[in-house]
Design a protein with these regions (language model features):
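Active-site mouth of glycoside hydrolases
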Residues: 3-124
């Protein structure tokens, strides 16, 4: 399923989807990949689609201020879930994230991925 290509409009103050105005109606589901069990993901997506959401903003890495228990799956090798060995990606995590993104698209919702939160950048 394709949701169409997003572009910036001519005034550079909004988005177009396949040439038509696109309103970015998003939910911030920052910790989806680390904190939402697969059994709950379909329910969540169904509910957000019913509410008219068309975008989910998700961190690809664990949210720095997460307060909910994590599922214990990390994007990179880690002993504590805070410090990562960036040279050792966890393929199971990334496969799960990709499957969750595909499920969102199947519900008509675009994943908008935040690649790196500032706490992972030294000196920020």
């Amino acid at each position: 399923m394709s949701l169409g290509k997003l572009t910036v409009n001519g005034r550079q103050d909004g988005f177009l989807c396949e040439g038509k105005p696109f309103f970015w109606f998003a939910d911030t589901c920052w910790s989806a990949f680390t904190s939402i069990p697969e059994a709950d993901w379909d329910y969540y997506l169904t509910r957000r689609a019913e509410q008219g959401m068309n975008v989910l903003q998700i961190n690809t890495l664990p949210q720095w201020d997460r307060c909910c228990p994590d599922l214990g799956i990390w994007p990179y090798a880690s002993e504590d879930g805070v410090h990562f060995d960036w040279s050792r990606p966890n393929q199971a995590y990334w496969d799960r994230a990709a499957a969750m993104c595909r499920a969102a698209v199947e519900h008509g919702i675009r994943p908008a991925l935040v690649l790196m939160w500032c706490n992972y950048v030294p000196g920020t």
